[in-house]
Amino acid sequence: MDTGEAAFGVASLRLRGSMASASSRRAPSYRDYDVFSIASSSRAEAEDDEEALKWAALEKLPTHARVRKGIVAAADDGQGSGAAGEVVDVAGLGFQERKHLLERLVRVAEEDHESFLLKLKQRIDRVGLDFPTIEVRYEHLSIDALAHVGSRGLPTFLNTTLNSLESLANLLHVVPNKKRPLNILHDVHGVIKPRRMTLLLGPPGSGKTTLLLALAGKLGSDLKVSGKVTYNGYGMDEFVAQRSAAYISQHDLHIPEMTVRETLAFSARCQGVGTRYDMLTELARREKAANIKPDPDLDVYMKAISVGGQETNIITDYVLKILGLDICADTIVGNEMLRGISGGQRKRVTTGEMIVGPARAMFMDEISTGLDSSTTFQIVKSLGQITSILGGTTVISLLQPAPETYNLFDDIILLSDGHIVYQGPREHVLEFFESMGFKCPDRKGVADFLQEVTSRKDQQQYWARTHQPYRYIPVQEFACAFQSFHVGQTLSDELSHPFDKSTSHPASLTTSTYGASKLELLRTCIARELLLMKRNMFVYRFRAFQLLVITIIVMTLFLRTNMHHETRTDGIVYLGALFFAMVAHMFNGFSELAMATIKLPVFFKQRDYLFFPSWAYTIPTWILKIPISCFEVAITVFLSYYVIGFDPNVGRLFKQYLLLLLVNQMAAALFRFIAALGRTMVVANTLASFALLVLLVLSGFILSHHDVKKWWIWGYWISPLQYAMNAIAVNEFLGHKWNRLVQGTNTTLGIEVLKSRGMFTEAKWYWIGVGALFGYVIVFNILFTIALGYLKPSGKAQQILSEEALKEKHANITGETINDPRNSASSGQTTNTRRNAAPGEASENRRGMVLPFAPLAVAFNNIRYSVDMPPEMKAQGVDQDRLLLLKGVSGSFRPGVLTALMGVSGAGKTTLMDVLAGRKTGGYIEGDISISGYPKKQETFARVSGYCEQNDIHSPNVTVYESLAYSAWLRLPSDVDSETRKMFIEQVMELVELNPLRDALVGLPGVNGLSTEQRKRLTIAVELVANPSIIFMDEPTSGLDARAAAIVMRTVRNTVDTGRTVVCTIHQPSIDIFEAFDELFLMKRGGEEIYVGPLGHHSCDLIEYFEGVEGVSKIKPGYNPATWMLEVTTLAQEDVLGISFTDVYKNSDLYQRNQSLIKGISRPPQGSKDLFFPTQFSQSFSTQCMACLWKQNLSYWRNPPYTVVRFFFSLIVALMFGTIFWRLGSKRSRQQDLFNAMGSMYAAVLFMGISYSSSVQPVVAVERTVFYRERAAGMYSALPYAFGQVVVELPYVLVQSAVYGVIVYAMIGFEWEAKKFFWYLYFMYFTLLYFTFYGMLAVGLTPSYNIASIVSSFFYGIWNLFSGFVIPRPSMPVWWRWYSWACPVSWTLYGLVASQFGDLKEPLRDTGVPIDVFLREYFGFKHDFLGVVAVAVAGFATLFAVSFSLSIKMLNFQRR
């Protein structure tokens, strides 16, 4: 619930006794907290009078004006006094004023937050107001889903096709549904009380997220739900649940270009102030009646958070402070390709985005992922204070809560396999499990115990009834036992008495759909869109530059000194120029597709959270782009109009400008609508290409109006480009330049030209065209709004379930025996991660690590790392050129020693690891790094090291087993045979417990496939199968629950025990995980080390060191040493103690020991040799090629949004073309017949090619991110990767071009001659191939998919212009004729037309010229040149493929 409810909810208007008399200046006898500023006798009389006068002036204002005014103390007044301040409008507080106000109210969040909230509560209580509260009940709640199980669930080409047909048959009730019902939650019930913090625990897959979504009213409609959820006795249909409660997702979806402050401010503005304003007015009224004068600072704060419509509300600054985000408030959020804040900070932004709003109930899903334990503790503590003091209702799901964080909660809900095992007070949970025979060991966190005690694999170690043999207690038995436990009985009794609705506070539940007025939401979205346009200005500048270049080319290509107004042929050339101008703006609008699609995930999240209606998003997107459209069209029209030699009439110039402006706007609106319809980049690209194709073919230029078949004439009349083409042609050809009468007729040349292409000849068609285009602009924007308003986000978080996993789940619930030999080996393992594990267990787990390796040590001395100073910091007055992130760090990592690299968020842990592992791509590195005494060489180091990145990056369309097989194939030495390799993979899978997931698809994070913890285990396994000597792990337990973290740490410990060097950054370890480490490398914020040394038994060495520092508080018995260590070494503690822990460390014996150790390791051992490998990579070039092709083949087969959609796109386009150009290929008696046939070829080549090029780009962009990780790991060189990416396309394009070619060739009616047929297939195949490879090349040459799509659209336009259809090669000026030979599309058209018609001698009926002569003279096409054309077309495919390979090899756009 709202932190700023730090103020309140609406009052219950209940008075608690008489107020003090109006004449009294003295507060009544409330002494608990000094909430109110009372004139002190020690103050000077003048100050007292001045203060009194200001308050008196405020008191005289009407209530609505008084709540907007407050007295702000001067910046240097640290006492919170308003005496020296001034009266201000609270809605207009500046950044510095807000900052100083918060400093006075909450100087240090850890220490002052609770007293601040108590002051707020005291002020509310004082006048007899109450906070609204919410009690959430859920009764007999069951949730089921339908899913395919096993291999049928994999999204392969075949499965997707079958599933689509099956879904259609299910709708028609032809066949039964073959999906299996999966039970997610089973008959759960409980009560969540206000003012109590509830912790939701449970292993992955237990149903935690589903329960939270159900309680927050955000379940998807595809789930089957029974039972009910009520708020204060009201059903979900009686109020707006999405605004009464806030759900905080575990997935961090944010706009990367916005800063942290901007992200939270936007959210606060959208969610509004709720009922704070109403409460404030009542509060002010009562205080005035009682003559109570509140503390000025508190008064200003409460007023400021109650006034809506502020660009940046002070509540944003408050939330930034309590979440520890104030240090990065003005840094952009960023993403994988755009450097921004850290993963832990991004997770806090996700939390802050919702708690700035006024919701009274909060459901938080895994909000601590990526955070260190002290930060998690502080955040949960702050949330707990808000909950208990201000009457909130809070449920938080945490994966690995430390004991001190666990103790902050009042109630526990423990879920396991969809059953509630326990819900009730935290104090009784251990009592319940002890009654079942299980006891939590000493030095074991209770939360960790609870996560593991219901697991079949972990339960036995906690069995406490030594006099009885252990038996597995299934989940169902726990759930039944809880019903008879006294806590369960109390809960049942409570549920049997319905909530009394009459006691529900009227302001508890929200009935309004949105948090602010519609006008305010529109203003907010306009402000954000302007901000994003400013941040993305490069895109618009680049687009304008492209248009300028194209315009210059058009001007010089259609130069008026070369253009004539003599014949109908001259007119057709001018018509081509007009057509191209129109097409250029259609292509320009194509780039809107990528920009709109990229923003959709964030839009859908905010829409579902009811931040704003879809129209508030679409109107700014449309309206704010109009000035850009005006500028872009001005470039093309005003520069080229007179140079080309269009009719020299100013009126016609501006009419052409208006028409092309409408085309530009229509195109942008159309592609935004298609983006909303497709929702994924691949599908949207395919739909957009299809739409573009249909519109242009039916525009009246490619195919004459008179030749459109009757069954397609409706398409002609609804095509916006038909109206545009007719209007722009009428505007030109009815001008005086074309008024000359054609010899032997009574019609002008202009009208003859229009008639020859089947266009309309009346002037009214210009205004009809303008009206139609304006209508389409409105219609497409309305459709865009409707699509965004009603369609669901694409892709669901899903996991492919195997039969084995289902059986195991059923057995865990019921207690039945599992007969699965594959898992039996691991079923007896425990999660004991301590170093004194049973010898038998250790040797059993280590058996998968027996491949030979060389133990290696890493030493580094005085490592400094800096980056260029961010512009945001320079703007705030920082004058240095570089920002130093690591300040002379030294240390060593040794074989057989497991080192924990720790520190608070922002300490530089990941930065140090990236520097040591050689993963930094930018910045400035200084210092020495040696490997077993020899200077580090990155190429060699990559062969012997592994790096588990914090972001789990994997190819999404392969299974878990295939990911491991691929890694092992490429990274294990070539002398390891296939059988050994497979056995090694199996052993690693067993160690990391991935066997049940072996056939699960990896998927994309947050979209589909593996869960966070499963993905994390896969990341570790991928590195382990490489058998490295040195392993770096960046937060291997982040995002895992306690049990999964224990599995991972057991694996890591076993890896170390084989003699490897392992270093892990770790954020929030439990006691047993922390003490699984041998040594600690502790850093503080700012990039300096403060402890480097052994932990000792039960962390005794670490504790002894820090307790030896004067002033440091002693550790409490049983307290987590990791948490204590982080708490006592904060910067705030340094200020309190007046010391620097860095200096303490540098002056210690430990530092001298480490320096000696570094010197020793930095000298090569006697008789040793530097690392040397005869080849750079483990495998030969040919093996790398085969492995990359193997993975790409699997990826393509399982990527139906790409392969299936593209296949059916080719099929539909073929049928469409066949019906539009039906039998036109057999007609060749007139010039127009040849133009029609060539039009079918031109349209197919250009637009199918564009579709293939556009749709491959997002696929390559996703895989390129994986490629950067795999190349950095030394798996392969760039060329084999490019080989796999290129070669895998060959069979797909072959099948698709063959399907298209056969259908189109037959339906259009080209000549049935084997040679001509195969020439047609040949040219179509290589054309689609070179377009596909060009799409890859565009991604390879640019940093992002967005830029690639804009660059591509530029070249599509150029190729269209020089294709030979818009203007034939002989008609081009001599200075541009050369480029037609460099344009691949012109070669394709040459080949297609010349192979079909170039050998025909029959004369044309309308001119009498033989066909072959006409083709040679008008187009420059010769039949005997076909061999050269064939080689050239294949050559372009080869050129683009080779260029893509070189771009991948030489360019790296990843910034680290």
From Swiss-Prot:
Binding of ATP 2, residues: G903, V904, S905, G906, A907, G908, K909, T910
Highest taxon of the lineage: Eukaryota
Molecular-function GO term, any one: ATP hydrolysis activity
SMART domains, A to Z: AAA
InterPro entries per UniProt: AAA+_ATPase, ABC2_TM, ABC_transporter-like_ATP-bd, ABCG_dom, ABCG_PDR_2, P-loop_NTPase, PDR_assoc
Chain intervals for the UniProt region annotation (Disordered): 812-844
Keyword Ribosomal protein on entry: no
Compartment annotation: Membrane
Family: Belongs to the ABC transporter superfamily. ABCG family. PDR (TC 3.A.1.205) subfamily.
Protein name according to UniProt: ABC transporter G family member 44
Organism: Oryza sativa subsp. japonica
Gene this protein is translated from: ABCG44
